Regions:
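N-terminal start-of-chain detector that recognizes signal peptides
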Residues: 78-81, 100-105
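A transmembrane-helix-recognition feature enriched in membrane-embedded lipid enzymes
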Residues: 42-79
Length: 170
């Protein structure tokens, strides 16, 4: 047992040393903010306020859709969507990113995560209320769409609606 413990300790030390050296290497690769700004296209800098202004409606959408599912999903016995499965903000921890790049990564991780979260909530809502495919093909349907009934299949709709609703239950 002692030999196994020593080996585990050595492996732990090696992992710690590796992570420390990797972090140092990443820090050396980080571009300074002044250099980053000098090398940025002027339109990137000028458009930043407009891009970042979207955080307000995105945050409101996040809050509103979360409240919607907290209130409505239990009423219809639809399993709630776990927000943390969609909204992941972790890239700011990367040592090779400067402050501006970290803020950009936080924004994009949050915004795209919220949209994916909203898409899953609205996909479950559509499955409950109207699980019918559209007459024309969608470019990128949500994950529930393939289970929907064909457009114009009235008998299939009546038959499949209870089955699809049961599939959403907690």
């Amino acid at each position: 047992m002692a030999g196994q413990t020593d080996l585990m300790d050595k492996l732990g030390d090696l992992q710690h040393d590796f992570e420390r050296e990797l972090r140092k290497a990443h820090k050396r690769l980080r571009q300074s903010i002044p250099a980053y700004l000098r090398e940025s296209h002027p339109l990137n800098i000028l458009s930043a306020p407009l891009i970042y202004s979207m955080i307000v409606p995105i945050a409101l959408l996040d809050l509103w859709v979360s409240c919607y599912q907290w209130i409505c999903f239990p009423l219809f016995r639809i399993k709630k969507v776990r927000r943390r499965d969609f909204v992941v903000v972790d890239r700011y921890k990367l040592a090779y990113l400067n402050g501006i790049e970290k803020v950009n990564c936080v924004y994009c991780g949050y915004a795209n995560g919220v949209f994916a979260y909203v898409r899953e909530i609205t996909g479950r809502t559509e499955t409950y209320w109207c699980p019918i495919r559209h007459a024309r093909k969608l470019r990128d349907p949500h994950g529930h769409y393939d289970d929907f009934v064909a457009y114009g299949d009235a008998a299939g709709y009546k038959r499949r609606l209870p089955v699809l609703r049961r599939g959403l239950k907690k």
